[in-house]
Amino acid sequence: MKKEWKEKQTSLGNAIIISAVTLIIGLAIGFASPNIFSNFAPYLGLSSSSSDINWSALDEVYNKLASTYNGEIDKSVVIDGAKKGLVDALGDKYTIYMNSEAASDFNDELHGNVGSGVGIEMGLRDGYVRVLRTLPDNPAKEAGILAGDIIYKVNDEEVYSLSTDEIASKVRGETGSEVTITVVRDGEEKSFTMKRETINNVSAFVEYDGQTAIITITRFDNDTGTMVQGFAKEFSDHGVNKVILDLRDNGGGYVSAAQDLLSLWLSGEKILIQKSKHYGDSTTSTKTGKAILSDMKTIVLVNGSTASASEITAGALQDYKKATIVGETTYGKGVVQNLFDLSGGTMLKVTTADWHTPLDRSINGVGITPDIEIERTYEDINTMKDPQMEKAKSL
């Protein structure tokens, strides 16, 4: 039966139900001890003395499965399932457990070490993971994959229900090896077979259009702030009198990188307010020093995939009236995650706080509304048209 591709939304209630089932299955299928918690709490990062969770219900499920389940049990897989289930049951899409492989991929991607792939950037749009753009001179672009395509299969495995990170890990592989990606475009399936290549994916680069400097930032990693500060120091040599900061399709990264970037426009100013149940309220400010772009005419480009640290940047520049924001309403990720390294190379990413802009605006689930709203369609992207950039250049 042919699958119908419609925009979809998963309700929070359904997500919690699914996650709760995952938790029970993850805990139940593999333990050989009659007491789950006391034997495996150390693997979960918990202690029996400090926990007030009643684990007897899970013990009951386990005991029944332990006496009836017909199959081999892999303890490491079960422990990973238990950890993932505990986290997924929270129903927070930003709080995730990563096994050692996923954690390694996450760190590599955050630092731009994506290895070998086909050169596509993906993100969640209208309920599906879609191609946001294809990188120039890379296999996906040459094969004909387009922005807006839904990622349906990788090597004949259906992946459309997986997360962006999970799909990305399946697309990557050995340099020179083949991968077949099936996409859905206008309701029709199209398959593309490509050879993986080493992908060079820097976090920031600058181009010049006359006296306008166009800075594109694809993510906020450890080097981003330093790179852009280096660009800015050369602006006088190019006679720059306007900066366009392109944050479109930038899903964020390190808050500290946004802090370094904003120090080009703000000196010792508050850039966000954090509100946390466990850590209390706090503020983050830029370093005190010469903000060399403080008086520079600045336009920031944003869209629906501009999120997290990118929204911190756009929100602060908008609040302080240091820039004109152009494009589409941003994603609306007004929460902060901290990374915690766990045993065995695993990792926990946990939502630890809400964040507001310097003027105490909450953007979570709402996004930042541009000062000038202009849409850029998938058709525009695929035909190399950019009305948002053209507007920014005209200001």
Question: Where are each of the predicted segments found?
Answer:
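Terminal targeting/pro-maturation regions of precursor/exported proteins
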Residues: 2-96
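PDZ/PDZ-like domain segments forming the peptide/carboxylate-binding groove
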Residues: 51, 113-153, 157-161, 222-225, ...
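Extracytoplasmic/secreted proteins, especially bacterial periplasmic and envelope-associated proteins
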Residues: 53-60, 64, 77, 81, ...
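Extended, small/polar residue-biased N-terminal targeting/export presequences
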Residues: 68-130, 178-179, 186-193
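PDZ/PDZ-like groove recognition
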Residues: 83, 116-135, 211-217, 292, ...
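Cleft-lining beta-strand/loop regions that shape enzyme active-site pockets
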Residues: 132, 141-143, 147, 155, ...
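Conserved P-loop NTPase
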Residues: 337-341, 348-379
